[in-house]
Amino acid sequence: MGSLETERKIVGWAATDSTGHLAPYTYSLRDTGPEDVFIKVISCGVCHTDIHQIKNDLGMSHYPMVPGHEVVGEVVEVGSDVTRFKVGDVVGVGVIVGSCKNCHPCKSEIEQYCNKKIWSYNDVYTDGKPTQGGFAESMVVHQKFVVRIPDGMSPEQAAPLLCAGLTVYSPLKHFGLKQSGLRGGILGLGGVGHMGVKIAKAMGHHVTVISSSDKKREEAMEHLGADEYLVSSDVESMQKAADQLDYIIDTVPVVHPLEPYLSLLKLDGKLILMGVINAPLQFVTPMVMLGRKSITGSFIGSMKETEEMLEFCKEKGVASMIEVIKMDYINTAFERLEKNDVRYRFVVDVAGSKLIH
């Protein structure tokens, strides 16, 4: 099928400088290529990474920038060589919309580790034009980087799974931590952390939430179903909990000591880092050596893992805790997210929003 029109003008909400303030912005989408899928956006999750990007925290931002990388929408048109999707399908798009296809990670179907991966926004596509994200009417994405949303899963529920859910699922799978009966720790109870509790519990793990204060105890235990709650500043409780956990998923995005958490791990336990921190973290080597422990990291997940994770969440009834907003609330939502004032993920109802004032 050919393209719907020669030049496709759409409206998104973009940041134009490092203040990070979003406002309506009109731009062009490329034609639907042979392997492209043209998607009308329904919902888009709001991730902490969006703030880093719109405010140029990583020093790599280009403006105007339309953020949003937890995108769920409906297929409006498919290219002539598209085999996996048809018009009317509900699909998802995550953090990546392109890769080189030739390197070891690409050939191993872990394209998120490709050194030439193309981000869904704040990047340059193969045609030389900037990529723009899901806080917009539509996107055009290569079929390789589109996933099917399972029947019966609502768009607003599916959106946060495409980043927060995947970020937790991928390392648990890769490091052989999916089997039931394991003891896991979740450090930090934000968007990724709350999905960590839910997914780990769905895998049959005994889950301990670790936090710097007692204020999220009821939330963790009563609402998210954690088995235990540990306050990291409570020395006695931390000592009692030593050598008990098979893994800890560390979602904290600011500098923090690692040694208190390394002490909680069993022999061969893994501390899996997921918070984006552009400053050195410290630990003393005996903490790792004497228990053959690992400090490792993980970055989102592959397209294959995304589809697996969505099916897993559907089968196990795993759902994100979300607050649905309209697009004109996005700047307030970012302010609240910076203060951790959300349970636990904002999702923009893009299709139900008036994008132009």
Curated annotation (Swiss-Prot):
Keywords: Lignin biosynthesis, Metal-binding, NADP, Oxidoreductase, Zinc. It catalyses: (E)-cinnamyl alcohol + NADP(+) = (E)-cinnamaldehyde + NADPH + H(+); (E)-coniferol + NADP(+) = (E)-coniferaldehyde + NADPH + H(+); (E)-sinapyl alcohol + NADP(+) = (E)-sinapaldehyde + NADPH + H(+); (E)-4-coumaroyl alcohol + NADP(+) = (E)-4-coumaraldehyde + NADPH + H(+). Its cofactor is Zn(2+). InterPro entries: ADH-like_C, ADH-like_N, ADH_Zn_CS, CAD-like, GroES-like_sf, NAD(P)-bd_dom_sf, PKS_ER. Binds 2 Zn(2+) ions per subunit. GO terms for molecular function: cinnamyl-alcohol dehydrogenase activity; coniferyl-alcohol dehydrogenase activity; zinc ion binding. Zn(2+) 1 binds at residues 47, 69-70, 163. Pathway: Aromatic compound metabolism; phenylpropanoid biosynthesis. Its EC number is 1.1.1.195. Zn(2+) 2 binds at residues 100, 103, 106, 114. PROSITE patterns: ADH_ZINC (PS00059). Gene3D superfamilies: Medium-chain alcohol dehydrogenases, catalytic domain (3.90.180.10), NAD(P)-binding Rossmann-like Domain (3.40.50.720). NADP(+) binds at residues 49, 167, 188-193, 211-216, 251, 275, 298-300. CDD domains: CAD1 (cd05283). One of its GO terms (biological process) is lignin biosynthetic process. Homodimer. Belongs to the zinc-containing alcohol dehydrogenase family. Involved in lignin biosynthesis. Catalyzes the final step specific for the production of lignin monomers. Catalyzes the NADPH-dependent reduction of coniferaldehyde, 5-hydroxyconiferaldehyde, sinapaldehyde, 4-coumaraldehyde and caffeyl aldehyde to their respective alcohols. This is Probable cinnamyl alcohol dehydrogenase. It comes from Populus deltoides.
